[in-house]
Amino acid sequence: MEEIALQYISCNLCGNIRTKVLYQIRAFTIVKCLNCGLVYLNPRPHPEQMMRVYDSHDYYFSGGKQTEMFYGYPDYTKLQKHLYFVADELMRPVRNIAPGKLLDVGCGMGFMLKRFQELGWESYGVDISSYATEYARSELGLNAYTGSIDKFDFPENYFDLVTIVLTIEHMPDPRSSLQTLHKLMKKGATIIIATHDIEGLWPKISRSKWQHLFVPEHFFFFSHGTLKRLLIQIGFDIVKMTETATLASVTGDGHGLRIPIKLIHEYNLENIAVPILRCFHAIARRLNFSDEVTIYAVKR
């Protein structure tokens, strides 16, 4: 097995280096900035080492086997119907926006990107995994590019909508990536970011046992507050924020709704399950039983 090469970083939100240890998980340390409250992995594996992890077949077809470097997905292709549902829910608040050019950052194998395309958007995707983007291109016929967002020569002021779904926590430098995206977006364009919220009620209760402390895959553990501050600093205005709890927190099923979602789609129960899921999310919001946040913001 490849030896893990660790690196120390400063806070991505405020640049401070003063932290306190929040959790120790296996060989990895999660810290909290004493200045702004951002939670992140420090030290962490070198980003190039993690890129090799994401580039592997085993990451997307791990069979549920966890390694020192990643949790992975038992079979990513079985999430297609669920990711279509996620895409539809994500677009509900912006359904009045006329479809234009869309960029999905962290598009993976392209299932959500495919759904965005079906909804009328001129869709582009980017992901650091060549394995995933090759699938998106060859199997789904999508415009999927391999690499980090700052490596592409998209024109400035080009995109009408940018989506970042459960990806920002993997980014080595979220600030730099968001600054790049800000340049690529038209004035008034919308960015949608969904990520786990470490300041939600469920993470506070479960602490180091919280299901979404995936280390070392997750470099950052944003809260709704730290993510909003980062977006505002870069030049976005917050227009909407929704918080909810994922079923993974309730079932103890750590990486993405494995048990209930599999049953729902295998037995074609979507017509029954989707209203129930929406009700579950509404109750979770009312009780503040949250561990995931979605922020809608526009470029100033």
Predicted regions and their residues:
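A SAM-dependent methyltransferase catalytic signature shared across enzymes that methylate proteins
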Residues: 12-19, 224-242
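A short glycine-rich, Lys/Arg-flanked "PGG" loop and its adjoining helix->strand segment in the class I
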Residues: 175-190
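Conserved N-terminal segment of class I S-adenosyl-L-methionine
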Residues: 1-165, 175-178, 243-244, 262-263, ...
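Short N-terminal helix/helix-N-cap motif within the alpha/beta-hydrolase-1
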Residues: 172-176, 203
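A transmembrane-helix-recognition feature enriched in membrane-embedded lipid enzymes
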Residues: 265-293
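Short, glycine-/aromatic-enriched active-site segment of Class I SAM-dependent methyltransferases
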Residues: 193-220, 225-232, 254-258
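Conserved catalytic loop of SAM-dependent methyltransferase domains
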Residues: 239-271
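Short catalytic micro-motifs in class I SAM-dependent methyltransferases
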Residues: 165-172, 217
